[in-house]
Regions:
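Short, well-structured N-terminal submotif of metal-dependent ribonuclease cores
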Residues: 1-39, 54-69
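Active-site neighborhoods of divalent-metal-dependent phosphate/nucleic-acid chemistry enzymes
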Residues: 60, 76-98
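Hydrophobic helix-cap positions at the C-terminus of alpha-helices
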Residues: 29-30, 73, 95
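Short, solvent-exposed helix-to-loop capping segments enriched in aromatics
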Residues: 69-77
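Short, conserved alpha-helical segments within structured domains
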Residues: 39-44, 84-88
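A general structural signal for well-ordered alpha-helical segments in protein cores
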Residues: 44, 66-70, 89
């Protein structure tokens, strides 16, 4: 399974992004194959913050449309939200201090 980064999500969503065609084609290909892929929650948050931001885009995506885009992706049977478990902080801390 692969995780899709914020940059791919933004480029695929925004038709005015310079790499829209490539990113959109990549996501469409993943969808057509039906291979499992993941949306990390931090990337979902970053996507929402980016595409709706008026300082980034002259015509930002309305929040409702951005939420619908994420909802469509998460609604696909082969897309999985990716999150850390409850032990994440303890494991990270132990690895960094070891």
């Amino acid at each position: 399974m692969i995780a899709i980064d914020t940059n791919i999500l933004v480029a695929a969503h925004r038709a005015d992004h310079p790499r829209h065609v490539l990113a959109d084609a990549a996501l469409r290909e993943l969808c057509l194959r039906g291979s499992p892929w993941a949306l990390p929650w931090p990337c979902v948050h970053e996507f929402l913050a980016n595409v709706t931001h008026p300082r980034i885009w002259p015509k930002p995506t309305p929040v409702g449309q951005a939420l619908e885009a994420i909802g469509r992706w998460l609604g696909l049977p082969f897309v999985h939200p990716l999150a850390e478990n409850q032990d994440y902080w303890a494991v990270l801390t132990s690895l960094l201090v070891a």
